[in-house]
Regions:
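C-terminal hydrophobic helical "lid"/dimerization subdomain
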Residues: 38, 178, 264, 268-272, ...
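Short N-terminal strand-loop motif that marks the start
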Residues: 1-78, 186, 190, 201, ...
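Residues in the short beta-alpha loop(s) of Rossmann-like NAD(P)-binding domains
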Residues: 238-243, 315, 338
Length: 401
């Protein structure tokens, strides 16, 4: 069986290519203990571009993709953010990306293995059709069951199901760690029971939140914190002007403040952050992908006592002085993943959100004519929108809605 799509390969000149691809359909399992199931056919309808795709393309250019290919293959169909049509079930679905011989793909441990459609060991969604484990084709909210055409506004919202699920998990982890980290402080301060102290700590963990970097990841983490902690003080930090559309949107939707650091030194950045939030941060989320974030948090002391540093960036190396790190009781953690429950929650939230407002489209014909050029000059350029997506199969789309 063949399909048309874009795929990664190890090639200095063509790490990403559009063309005919042989489809494979090995049995896959969703979770440890479950039966491996042969995939059922699905047609990708609306696809989103993710920074992971761009990084995989760079790996292909450097010849480093062998570990990512499906077994026995020398290419990987890319894409892991999509709304698909499942003809055998006559419905739209969101593909749960992560599965495998794992009790919980979020708590991946050494004795477990997992795959990710479009990223690691399993072909993805930038193709005319593919096969997916039927247990991993998640339903849209009940009010949308029975749709035969996908409204454009809904498609734009649901294309964020993967990254927003990450944000749901990020909030959950910060809350878990924050309660464990801070309940004894609250207990000593308030002379209350352990259970009461836990609830106080659940909120005080998010008293002063710094989100260093304003892309979709930072935006969604901020949104999750605001939805769960109405009194949290949230500050986005970035280099974009406060007058840009994305900054205005983030401030309005998340009810957050913003600091533009374009002309500031690191020391000035730290000073202004502390001034803006009224003290040192209780949570510092690094999502800028730069080394500046950890220096601002640790060297310049933006992260306060008992503070949590959430590293969501891929690439930077975190360094810190062990003396203040130890005496100020800091915690550093990183957890870039999610489970089915997180994605199902994300789908429900997104369907009623305004996040369709930050998605812009690239024409499919323009993209497939030269996908590398599109990635480098349209989708991930400095002038790129917060999110780019493509209508992959217009036959299942309602473009007027």
């Amino acid at each position: 069986m063949k399909t048309l799509g874009t795929y990664f390969q190890n090639s200095e000149t063509e790490p990403l290519k559009y063309g005919e691809v042989n489809l494979i359909n090995p049995p896959r399992q969703r979770l440890r203990g479950e039966e491996k199931l042969t995939g059922i056919e699905a047609f990708p309808v609306f696809n989103g571009f993710c920074g992971t795709d761009f990084e995989l393309m760079k790996m292909g250019r450097a010849g480093n993709l062998n570990a990512k290919f499906p077994e026995g293959e020398k290419r990987l169909i890319n894409g892991h953010e999509s709304v698909v049509w499942v003809p055998s079930e006559n419905r739209f679905a969101i593909v749960l990306i992560r599965g495998g011989d794992s009790c919980d793909p979020t708590r991946y441990t050494e004795d477990e293995t997992y795959f990710e459609y479009g990223c690691d060991g399993a072909d993805g969604l930038f193709c005319d059709k593919n096969y997916f484990n039927p247990q991993m084709l998640l339903h849209l909210p009940e009010k949308y069951e029975g749709l035969k055409k996908l409204p454009l506004s809904l498609a734009k919202k649901l294309v964020f199901s993967d990254p927003y699920a990450c944000a749901v998990f990020q909030h959950e982890r910060m809350e878990d760690i924050g309660m464990a980290q801070n309940f004894r402080v609250e207990k000593a301060k308030r002379k209350c029971s352990d259970a009461e102290a836990m609830e106080y700590a659940r909120e005080s963990t998010f008293d002063r939140v710094v989100i260093f970097g304003l892309g979709t990841t930072g935006l969604f983490i901020g949104d999750q914190i605001r939805r769960n902690h109405e009194n949290a003080k949230i500050l986005f930090v970035g280099r974009s002007s406060e007058e840009t559309a994305k900054v205005k949107f983030a401030k309005e939707v998340v009810k957050a403040d913003y600091l533009c650091t374009d002309s500031m030194s690191e020391a000035e950045t730290a000073e202004n952050i502390i001034k803006k939030i009224g003290g040192r941060s209780t949570v510092f989320v690094g999502v800028s992908g730069t080394n500046v974030e950890h220096r601002v948090a640790f060297e310049h002391k933006v992260l306060g006592c008992n503070g949590i540093y959430n590293s969501f960036s891929l690439g930077p190396k975190i360094t810190f002085d062990t003396m203040p790190f130890g005496f100020e009781n800091h915690v550093i953690f990183a957890s870039i993943n999610f489970t089915q429950a997180h994605m199902e929650k994300a789908i429900e939230i997104l369907s009623e959100s305004r996040f369709d407002e930050i998605v812009e489209l690239i024409d499919k014909e323009e993209f497939i004519a030269d996908p590398i050029y599109a990635y480098e000059n349209k989708i991930y350029s400095k002038a790129a929108p917060l999110k780019t997506a493509v209508v992959w199969n217009k036959n299942y789309m309602e473009m007027e809605k």
